[in-house]
Design a protein with these regions (language model features):
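Conserved beta-strand->loop/alpha-helix structural units within folded catalytic cores of enzymes
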Residues: 188-193, 216-218
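Glycine-rich beta-alpha loop elements in corrinoid/cobalamin-binding modules
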Residues: 1-21
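C-terminal accessory regions of radical SAM enzymes
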Residues: 5-10, 204-219
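Radical SAM [4Fe-4S] cluster-binding motif and immediate context
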Residues: 23-191, 198, 204-207, 211
Length: 219
């Protein structure tokens, strides 16, 4: 007909509540790149996040329910990197790696740890997680045993009103400095994400952010 190409398809796709089955995603074609030109390799275990931070597009793109790959998929991707000769950092690009804690603790992390032990720890892992990681000593211990040494955490702001404003409820009412130090105490370096410019921010927000970073020892 005379309608622009893709109009009908676009309407259908934009209204769907279906998500891709990531258990069917192929192993990345690492042979298409020169890995020697990269500081780190990326793999993905899950998509989606149970939280609803107002500024974040991830839940719109991937949904609130974390969808996860099978453990053997993750190991196969690690195998493929290892076979390509990669030795070094591997970043799990999940926006919240710990969205499904039970599966991680019971299956995925123990399997990765065993895989690493069998190959004399060829990789170091980093990822992103919500601050409630600090509430789960077993999870932090298993992450370190599996080879994780760095985690990025969205701190955003030490100002409670600003956390309320952006619906970052998982950070509200917490001693965020203590949470960071707890994560660090298990051997994980904490990198932090921060935001300034909320309507609720006081004039002192820059000084408060600097003070928080210095107190927490965050990277």
């Amino acid at each position: 007909g005379s309608e622009p190409l893709g109009t009908e398809l676009g309407a259908e796709v934009s209204g769907t509540d279906l998500w891709a089955d990531i258990k069917t995603t192929p192993i990345p074609a690492w042979e298409l790149i020169n890995t020697k030109k990269y500081a780190s390799m990326n793999i993905q275990y899950s998509r989606g996040c149970p939280f609803n931070c107002e500024f974040c597009d991830i839940t719109l793109l991937y949904g609130h329910k974390p969808r996860i790959k099978a453990t053997q998929q993750v190991l196969a991707e690690l195998d493929s990197l290892y076979a390509r000769g990669w030795r070094g950092g591997v970043f799990f690009v999940d926006d919240n790696f710990i969205g499904n804690k039970g599966k991680l603790k019971n299956e995925v992390l123990p399997a990765i740890g065993q895989w690493m032990d069998q190959r004399k720890h060829p990789f170091t892992f980093s990822t992103q997680a919500s601050i409630d990681l600090a509430d789960d000593p077993e999870l932090m211990r298993l992450m370190v045993q599996a080879g994780f040494n760095t985690v990025f955490v969205g701190i955003e702001t030490p100002n409670q009103d600003s956390l309320e404003e952006c619906s970052k409820f998982q950070n509200k009412g917490r001693d965020l400095v203590a949470c960071v130090k707890t994560i660090q105490s298990f051997g994980l370096q904490v990198e932090g994400g921060f935001i300034v410019g909320f309507d609720s921010d006081p004039h002192s927000i820059f000084e408060r952010q600097i003070e928080f970073i210095q107190k927490s020892g965050i990277v």
